[in-house]
């Protein structure tokens, strides 16, 4: 939808969370390795909120504690330790992570802190075994340059990543501690972004700076973007967990749509003198004979059915606020998160879901529901229903006041759903187990003198030095394999850099699309591959099949792969002999067409020699031998 974002007063700020590719974790010597094999053990614990140094309890932390969940943590004996399990004090901060934080800060023109104080940020959703995340403020007041103008960078913090969520049950959440403690940069921008396109460009530019260091992890889940969005007469909404850069634009557009829609609903409710009735009524007896599967299952499990009346809300609950999501979805999200129920029904969508028209009439009569009113009902265990409907009552009241400030979860379709209230500042307090870090002028001078080459500079160099075309150079500059490309190109000067680049950027991706696990392909495999090419052990046409061979047989050497695939390189004499045989086998076509038989013969030569001899050698040899026959 086309909006005048300037008129709407759109303000957007970003929080970028990027994992660092360091040798060790931030507060222990464990490797920064994510695993998917069977864990060696589990522990269980329950977390509770405590007061900050100011004597306050954070409302988001308090909300999590009310869910009364148990947390289960998986661990590995060889790649995790007691620090992750909160049974051993943290070690000193990893120097490599601090150096990277200073490097990124310098690239974003930021002012460094003289002394870095480690803080504890209260988090009791179970994602940290200790109930808090260790974080440290490194720099502030910087900026990045984009095609839309400069965007301020508020702060850069170095912190530990949280546990990896494995499973979310009704009364428990299971995590793995392999991700806990991986160094993470948190970069926060000023709300200088004024359009969805500008938001995407800002995130892209920050990502470019991070990748330029060569010290960040790549792949799904290694970078997470949170987006703070507000408009005039709206509210600040924090959208968590946008993993896809291309989704940022749509997230911003859809949040603007949501806030405009919620404001329109508010105005309509005020015109109607709408009212939220606080009373929760038990309607279990009224609907005890229903044929609705959802309601029957709840009653079968000794649950109850209860309802609330919303005066003046008829037609409003079913009104769309985002593509495919309605005000009723907003109510349902609150009930699900705060009550733990599966969902709710409302009269804007009934009769439906097995609830008959006759039952709706009885329900409206029992609830004293007028023509402009609406009823919401929930079926589940009594305590869950009470919590859910109280949450819906609160959200319904908010819909007559405006837009509540919330933290929301990014969905894959560009919409968002409720997570929790916006956290406050009451959840931060100093870390007492780790000493502060002094940032010296000598350290900063070293960082400034060793800054990495920026991608735009590298692009120009790749076109000039390696003779890549601009499109391939752009791909290579942004590639995870960029350092490997330079290493291989310098080491194997006999091989054209274009072949190395297309192998790393195109061939491997094509093989992955065929369904092979390219994660099994190592740098050592690629080193062997290009070494074999440079020594004429194989032809360039054999590259895709050799890569597949390494994936299928990760422990085999190149010579073994070539033997398995039947692709050992032939001598010039062997190639000449085979081509001569092919010409003799097709002599009638040669006599009839002369040099015009070249295409037919080339196809037959390649069918027999592909991967065993260089295509250029095959072509020149065939031309030479064919001319001899024709003459």
Curated annotation (Swiss-Prot):
UniProt KW keywords: ATP-binding, Ligase, Nucleotide-binding, Protein biosynthesis
Catalytic activity of the protein: L-glutamyl-tRNA(Gln) + L-glutamine + ATP + H2O = L-glutaminyl-tRNA(Gln) + L-glutamate + ADP + phosphate + H(+)
This protein's record includes keyword Nucleotide-binding: yes
Biological process annotations from GO: glutaminyl-tRNAGln biosynthesis via transamidation; translation
Superkingdom, taxonomy of origin: Archaea
Pfam families: GAD, GatB_N, GatB_Yqey
EC top class named in words: ligase
Keyword Ligase set for record: yes
GO CC annotations on file: cytoplasm
Disulphide linkage map: none
Family membership: Belongs to the GatB/GatE family. GatE subfamily.
Function per UniProt: Allows the formation of correctly charged Gln-tRNA(Gln) through the transamidation of misacylated Glu-tRNA(Gln) in organisms which lack glutaminyl-tRNA synthetase. The reaction takes place in the presence of glutamine and ATP through an activated gamma-phospho-Glu-tRNA(Gln). The GatDE system is specific for glutamate and does not act on aspartate.
Subunit architecture: Heterodimer of GatD and GatE.
Family matches, as HAMAP family: GatE
Name of the protein described by the UniProt record: Glutamyl-tRNA(Gln) amidotransferase subunit E
Source organism (scientific name): Methanococcus maripaludis (strain DSM 14266 / JCM 13030 / NBRC 101832 / S2 / LL)
């Amino acid at each position: 939808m086309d909006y005048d974002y300037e008129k709407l007063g759109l303000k957007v700020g970003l929080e970028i969370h990027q994992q660092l590719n360091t040798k060790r974790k931030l507060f222990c010597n464990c490797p920064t390795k994510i695993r998917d094999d069977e864990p060696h053990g589990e522990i269980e614990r329950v977390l509770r909120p405590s007061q900050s140094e100011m004597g306050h309890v954070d409302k988001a932390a308090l909300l999590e504690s009310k869910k009364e969940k148990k947390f289960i943590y998986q661990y590995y004996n060889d790649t995790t330790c007691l620090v992750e399990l909160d049974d051993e004090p943290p070690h000193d901060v990893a120097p490599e992570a601090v150096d990277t934080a200073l490097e990124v800060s310098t690239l974003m023109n930021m002012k460094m802190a003289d002394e870095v104080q480690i803080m504890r940020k209260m988090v009791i959703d179970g994602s940290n075994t200790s109930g808090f995340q260790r974080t440290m403020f490194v720099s502030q007041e910087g900026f990045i340059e984009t095609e839309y103008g400069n965007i301020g960078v508020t702060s850069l913090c170095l912190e530990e990543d949280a546990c990896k969520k494995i499973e979310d049950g009704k009364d428990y959440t299971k995590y793995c501690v392999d991700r806990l403690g991986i160094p993470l940069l948190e970069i926060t921008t000023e709300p200088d972004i004024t359009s969805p396109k500008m938001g995407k460009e800002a995130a892209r530019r920050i990502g470019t700076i991070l990748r330029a260091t060569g010290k960040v992890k790549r792949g799904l889940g290694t970078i997470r973007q949170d987006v703070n969005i507000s408009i005039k007469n709206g509210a600040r909404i924090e959208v968590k967990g946008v993993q896809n850069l291309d989704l940022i634009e749509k997230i911003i557009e859809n949040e603007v749509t949501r806030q405009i829609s919620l404001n329109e609903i508010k105005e309509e409710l005020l015109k109607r003198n709408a009212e939220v009735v606080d009373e929760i009524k038990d309607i279990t007896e009224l609907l005890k004979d229903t044929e609705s599967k959802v309601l029957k299952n709840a009653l079968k499990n000794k649950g109850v059915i209860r309802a609330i009346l919303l005066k003046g809300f008829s037609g409003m609950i079913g009104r769309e606020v985002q593509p495919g999501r309605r005000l009723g979805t907003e109510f349902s999200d609150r009930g699900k998160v705060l009550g733990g129920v599966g969902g709710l029904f409302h009269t804007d969508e009934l009769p439906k879901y097995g609830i008959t028209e006759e039952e709706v009439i009885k329900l409206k009569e029992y609830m004293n529901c007028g023509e402009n009113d609406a009823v919401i009902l929930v079926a589940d265990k009594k305590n869950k229903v009470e919590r859910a409907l109280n949450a819906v009552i609160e959200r319904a009241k908010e819909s007559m006041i405006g837009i509540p400030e919330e933290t929301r979860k990014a969905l894959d379709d560009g919409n968002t759903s409720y997570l929790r209230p916006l956290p406050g500042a009451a959840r931060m307090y100093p870390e007492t187990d780790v000493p502060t870090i002094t940032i010296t002028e000598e350290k900063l001078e070293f960082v400034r003198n060793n800054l990495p080459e920026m991608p735009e500079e590298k692009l120009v160099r790749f076109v000039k030095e390696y003779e890549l075309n601009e499109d391939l150079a752009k791909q290579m500059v942004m590639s995870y394999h960029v350092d490997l490309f330079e290493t291989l190109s310098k080491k194997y000067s006999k091989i054209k850099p274009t072949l190395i680049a297309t192998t790393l950027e195109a061939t491997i991706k094509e093989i992955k699309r065929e369904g092979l696990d390219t994660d099994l392909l190592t740098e050592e495999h690629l080193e062997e591959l290009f070494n074999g090419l440079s020594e004429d052990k194989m032809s360039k046409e054999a590259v895709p099949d050799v890569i597949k061979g390494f994936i299928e047989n990760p422990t085999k050497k190149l010579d073994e792969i070539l033997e398995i695939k039947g692709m050992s390189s032939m001598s010039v004499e062997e190639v000449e002999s085979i081509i001569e045989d092919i010409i003799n086998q097709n002599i009638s076509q040669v006599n009839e067409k002369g040099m015009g038989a070249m295409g037919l013969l080339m196809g037959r030569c390649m069918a027999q020699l592909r991967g065993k001899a260089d295509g250029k050698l095959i072509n020149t040899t065939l031309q030479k031998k064919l001319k001899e026959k024709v003459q």
